[in-house]
């Protein structure tokens, strides 16, 4: 009798496992690549540090510059990469008290943004900037929504003074556990939820984001490569779903501050998979 019960339990378990409802939430590579992949999909890593430009230039068509090594290096990186660029301007725009307080808008933010954009323009780098990024995870970092609205208006005011930025748009990555404040202002919208792995693609948060998109808005997917997540489901999903405009893996370089909690893609055994993913996108675009 015990053996019979065990067999019945095993049969039921297999049936549940194979059911579409369960399989939908199982981390796997079963998201198939579409027959007609996109030709305009963007692929590039969140932020940049160390020798990332030379290490990734052969398999990205998107560059994300966060100025982690200062303005001079940022300009050099953008010129060397010569790809569609997302430029983080938080260094010019925001300040905070201590290491835990909210970010507030600097009184002289406009002057600093214009001065930096002028340096980029004079160096011939500004023409590569297609998206401006006021600050990372604004729903988790900025003082309040009013502050973010002011920052967004300031970015557009500064950009209006440069012919290279005619038609420039905004990009954002939100924290997953809080409302997407000011989402309507951004053309490229993403959120990070690394614990969900590829299940994030069928999560309620993703469905809500997709349903809330306005005209001209697209989603960027953020696979957690630094945490061992396979890029394949994200690339396949991006190619199969019209609302996805970019895949922005986190994180190529090795963060030694301790905030990431793991090595980057370049060193954690995931490098080959992400290089192949990038080349699959760039070969088509």
Enumerate the predicted regions with their spans:
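Feature marks short, highly hydrophobic, charge-poor N-terminal signal-anchor/signal peptide-like helices
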Residues: 1-5
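Membrane-interface motif at the C-terminal end of an N-terminal transmembrane signal
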Residues: 12-28
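Glycan-processing catalytic domains of CAZymes
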Residues: 25-285
């Amino acid at each position: 009798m015990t053996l019979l019960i065990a067999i019945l339990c095993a049969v039921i378990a297999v049936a549940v496992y194979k059911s579409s409802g369960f399989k939908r939430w199982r981390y796997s590579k079963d998201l198939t690549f579409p027959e007609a992949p996109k030709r305009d999909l963007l692929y590039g890593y969140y932020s940049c540090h160390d020798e990332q430009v030379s290490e990734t230039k052969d398999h990205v068509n998107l560059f994300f510059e966060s100025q982690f090594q200062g303005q001079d290096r940022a300009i050099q990186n953008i010129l060397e990469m010569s790809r569609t660029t997302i430029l983080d301007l938080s260094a010019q725009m925001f300040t905070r008290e201590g290491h835990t307080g909210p970010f507030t808008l600097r009184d002289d933010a406009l002057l600093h943004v214009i001065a930096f954009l002028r340096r980029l323009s004079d160096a011939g780098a500004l023409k590569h900037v297609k998206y401006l990024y006021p600050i990372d995870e604004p729903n988790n970092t900025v003082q309040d929504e009013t502050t973010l609205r002011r920052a967004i208006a300031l970015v557009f005011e500064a950009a209006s003074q440069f012919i290279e930025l005619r038609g420039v748009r905004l990009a954002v990555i939100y924290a997953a556990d809080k409302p997407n404040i000011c989402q309507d202002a951004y053309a490229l919208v993403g959120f990070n939820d690394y614990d969900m792995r590829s299940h994030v693609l069928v999560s309620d948060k993703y469905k809500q984001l997709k349903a809330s998109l306005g005209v001209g808005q697209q989603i960027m997917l953020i696979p957690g490569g630094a945490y061992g997540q396979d890029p394949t489901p994200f690339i396949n999903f991006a190619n199969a779903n019209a609302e996805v405009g970019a895949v922005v893996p986190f994180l190529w370089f090795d963060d030694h501050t301790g905030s990431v909690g793991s090595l980057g893609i370049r060193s954690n055994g995931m490098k080959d998979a992400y290089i192949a993913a990038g080349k699959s996108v760039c070969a088509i675009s």
